[in-house]
């Protein structure tokens, strides 16, 4: 009987705020039961049931028109019919599985290959653990550091892995940058795309005629936000509005920027660059979302052992990443990738040329000692692991690491028995050499 005279939590607070003589109450962050009942009514019965629940609970209309339309459009029926075996026990069990995302995805995913694959990321040695924490902010007004150019530069300079979480992906040029990094440089790319943006992404791929055959080293997966479940079992999923890029586990680009033409040219956005311990938080969030994602295009179950394998030797990560935390001026400069700026000296330019697709923040590698003449060719040229780029500081062979390089060509051929030792003294250079 007293249910109709009940005053909702939001309505009561509005009345207190409007009355200037009322003392401010303590902030209450508990759940609003009236709002939950009204949302369940909207999910089960539509707008009329929603208004009826608001009237019974004495609550104000707390949903915007866009939110109400989204809930009705994304509503899904429960996977199991309520008439199935189990009776009343099926209701609470279905509610628990829907409301607790960790209880839904992780126990199921831990039995497959993907969670074990993600678990190797934790065991791998991360370069960001040796970096000093820093943060740099970029705005759209900075014409010298266009946000779109910074994102594309990050993709073009990746050398091992790119982990991308995005809500909208319709920029064809950024797609070309990702395809070039994966197909030309062997960079493993994993893109987690919001379920709401899947249709637009597939539309872009159809326009430019991109299919699975072009995504040999790319894994594109769809992911949803949190799941809201009513007591009846009907549910709807939220959106992924997080956007960030993890490049080689060294730094993260995060902000409001989406992979679209409007965001690159018209919309105003903000972009933040994080290094150091903050990268680990983004890595953990990416792995959690990866565990609940579904394959969309490209690799269905990628084997990340080769791309994610840490560098051989304990000194390789230090030598490659110490330049990012040497000075504060490098972290707070106008250009986050100082080696790509036009004012770089000749030494930095030669470094970026020799290191290929290595990081733009990589320091000058130490000089590789030349091997002694008694080292053999087989010992100097060691087999490299698959998909790991060669770098001067990772044990690459020196240019002159063999005894054969210090001897004339004719003496080398004589040792192999390919050239007769007796030649005419007056015609030493006319002797025909055998062709291999």
Swiss-Prot record:
Tree of life domain: Eukaryota
Gene3D superfamilies noted in UniProt: Endonuclease Chain A
Region (DUF1669) location: 1-298
Keyword annotations of the record: Cytoplasm, Mitochondrion, Phosphoprotein, Proto-oncogene
Post-translational modification Phosphoserine, affected residues: 301, 329, 350, 359
GO cellular component: cytoplasm; mitochondrion
Region (Disordered): 73-95, 302-371
Protein name as catalogued: Protein FAM83A
